A protein has these predicted regions:
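Catalytic-core segments of class I nucleotidyltransferases/pyrophosphorylases
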Residues: 83, 97, 101, 105, ...
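Conserved beta-loop-beta/alpha segment of the NTase-like Rossmann-fold superfamily
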Residues: 19, 29-32, 41-131, 174-176
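Phosphate- and divalent-cation-binding pockets in alpha/beta enzyme and binding domains
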Residues: 18-19, 68, 189, 220
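Short internal beta-strands
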Residues: 9-13, 113-114
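A short, N-terminal amphipathic alpha-helix
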Residues: 1-10
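Conserved N-terminal/central alpha/beta ligand/cofactor-binding core
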Residues: 24-25
Length: 228
């Protein structure tokens, strides 16, 4: 909400109903608050009641990739541009989404969060090449490739899980062929849009990146967040 977001859509599977229950299990929260009289839980419940008015859920029951997950929201998204956040990629200490929205409002185009990664790990990321520098932290993107091999990667500049995308990407995703691992990759559709002349900006964010995509990374991230 600090970034000005007014509607949130969670894309979950039937196995992840616990996320939905977190927002809608009023009886549980009221029981715990009454029993423990914990002010922190009461404050958290107050936040949840506020946010759940903004939230919708859609289901991706078969894991067919990030692109397929985003496509599930097609009927809900009404604006020309929308923000996508991947839960495996956390950015703390600075509000990356707010910074990206500010850039989008100025440049009127798509924006993606980015950072330098170890050259030996480029095959884990969407990797892009720069077309033109805007300033030291923002660049127009020339091309982007999903998980390239180390030798053919255009750089070690990686896209991190924050995207401001145009609504027209849904047409690309609908017709997108399966990519690596048999999944629909959002990077492939972004690449097609760039080839069509759509402008994309990479934003090197100021916050701290936490990788929650592995159990080891999740544990480290939990420790880091609990330091606050």
């Amino acid at each position: 909400t600090q970034a000005g977001i007014k509607e949130i859509v969670f894309i979950i599977s039937k196995k992840k109903e616990i996320i939905k229950k977190y927002f809608y299990n009023d009886a549980f929260y009221k029981r715990i608050i009454k029993k423990k009289k914990d002010l922190r839980i009461a404050q958290e419940y107050k936040k949840i009641k506020k946010y759940k008015k903004m939230i919708k859920f859609v289901y991706q029951n078969n894991p067919k990739g990030t692109g397929d997950a985003v496509l599930k929201t097609k009927k809900i998204i009404k604006d020309k541009f929308f923000l996508v956040l991947l839960p495996d990629d956390l950015i703390i200490k600075k509000n990356c989404s707010k910074a990206m929205i500010s850039i989008h409002n100025k440049k009127k185009c798509s924006v993606m969060a980015s950072m330098k990664v170890n050259k030996k790990t480029v095959n884990r990321w969407g990797i892009f090449s720069k077309k033109k520098n805007i300033n030291k932290n923002n660049f127009y993107i020339d091309d982007v490739v999903e998980k390239p091999n180390i030798k053919s990667a255009p750089s070690n500049d990686a896209v991190i899980g924050r995207y401001i995308l145009p609504k027209k990407i849904f047409t690309k995703l609908k017709n997108q062929k399966k990519g690596k691992g048999g999944e629909i990759h959002i990077t492939d559709s972004i690449r097609e849009l760039i080839n069509d002349g759509e402008k994309f900006i990479a934003h090197n964010f100021d916050g701290k990146y936490l990788d929650c995509g592995t159990m080891k990374g999740y544990i480290k991230s939990s420790i880091e967040i609990n330091k606050k």
